[in-house]
């Protein structure tokens, strides 16, 4: 359900397009710049565009490197000249969700990132929950307040901010924990980022997807899990959708039932992807991921 404020602020054509997509359960394929990090900001986008990719996810790291010799306006022109739509940004700021001594500094850094990415035309921004600090049950009471503070900053820039649960996090590593915390915070500019790899390789179960309510997913990272001992899985071992053993069809159908109709952003870390030719990497991703999406009836 769209709010009155959203209706007034959103062009009718966009509202109609999204309504049709939600009703049909359709999603779009995107690629995260972490996947081609070795190529840099411009070359990653150029290669993907040549391969037919239309939706992209920007990283603060590659954008920062680009801005050492160019401008934010030029970064925007790279996107527009290639006909690319930026759907989300990795803000590159940690320490936002958990109680920690550097939280105030993290909020200041996050505000600067919001200004940067809002200027670039991004609608969404996210930060993972990764941390190795030790916590007690009492520490979880601070989470919702931290979320509200982050949400208020994002609101100033008309951004949706998302937390991505990380399988190795000592604070928020599972979907149920993140859902509970965001619901307690109840901030209108806050959503969850659902990562297929962190979900299936982490301490979650398929039934946890039933806990999601329509509208709670703000963005999705789309990968597969290799058929290796689970003890060997880490952040780098994720692979292209269709190459692994995760129940992607069932997971895609479930998030479609939850009315997600956004991008499925492929984020990979293996050197063969990050140091590979962005065009060839994107072409392989399309060849493998799009059939998976069609089989699940989300493309």
Region locations from a protein language model:
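N-terminal small/glycine-rich loop or linker at the start of catalytic domains
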Residues: 24-30, 88-96
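Active-site-proximal loop/turn and secondary-structure-junction residues that shape catalytic pockets
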Residues: 35-37, 60-62, 92-95, 129-133, ...
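Histidine-acidic metal/acid-base catalytic patches
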Residues: 2, 7-12, 22-28, 33, ...
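Active-site acidic/histidine proton-transfer and metal-coordination neighborhood
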Residues: 11, 16, 25, 42-43, ...
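Residue-level detector of anion-binding/catalytic polar loops
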Residues: 54-55, 85, 123, 160, ...
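Short, solvent-exposed loop/turn segments at secondary-structure boundaries
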Residues: 67-70, 98-104, 136-141, 203-206, ...
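Glycine-rich, proline-tolerant flexible connector loops at the mouths of alpha/beta enzymes
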Residues: 58-76, 134
């Amino acid at each position: 359900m769209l709010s009155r404020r959203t209706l007034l602020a959103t062009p009718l054509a966009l509202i109609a397009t999204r309504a049709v997509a939600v009703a049909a359960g359709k999603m779009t394929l995107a690629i995260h710049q972490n996947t081609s990090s070795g190529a840099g900001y411009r070359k990653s986008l150029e290669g993907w565009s040549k391969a037919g990719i239309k939706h992209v996810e920007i990283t603060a790291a590659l954008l920062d490197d680009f801005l050492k010799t160019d401008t934010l306006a030029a970064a925007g022109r790279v996107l527009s000249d290639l006909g690319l739509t930026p759907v989300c940004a990795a803000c590159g700021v940690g320490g936002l969700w958990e109680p920690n001594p550097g939280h105030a500094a993290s909020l200041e850094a996050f505000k600067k990132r919001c200004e940067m990415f809002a200027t670039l035309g991004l609608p969404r921004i996210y930060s993972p929950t990764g941390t190795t600090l030790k916590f007690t049950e009492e520490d979880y009471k601070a989470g919702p307040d931290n979320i509200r503070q982050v949400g208020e900053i994002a609101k100033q820039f008309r951004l949706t901010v998302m937390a991505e649960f990380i399988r190795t996090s000592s604070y928020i590593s599972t979907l149920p924990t993140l859902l509970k915390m965001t619901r307690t915070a109840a901030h209108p500019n806050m959503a969850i980022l659902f990562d297929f790899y962190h979900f299936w390789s982490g301490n979650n179960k398929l039934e946890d997807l039933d806990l999601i309510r329509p509208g709670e997913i703000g963005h999705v990272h789309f990968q597969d899990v290799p058929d290796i001992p689970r003890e060997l899985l880490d952040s780098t071992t994720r692979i292209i959708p269709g190459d692994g053993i995760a129940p992607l069809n069932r997971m895609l159908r479930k998030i479609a039932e939850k009315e997600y109709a956004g991008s499925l952003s492929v984020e990979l870390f293996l050197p063969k992807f990050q140091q590979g030719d962005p065009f060839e990497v994107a072409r392989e991703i399309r060849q493998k991921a799009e059939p998976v999406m069609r089989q699940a009836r989300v493309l």
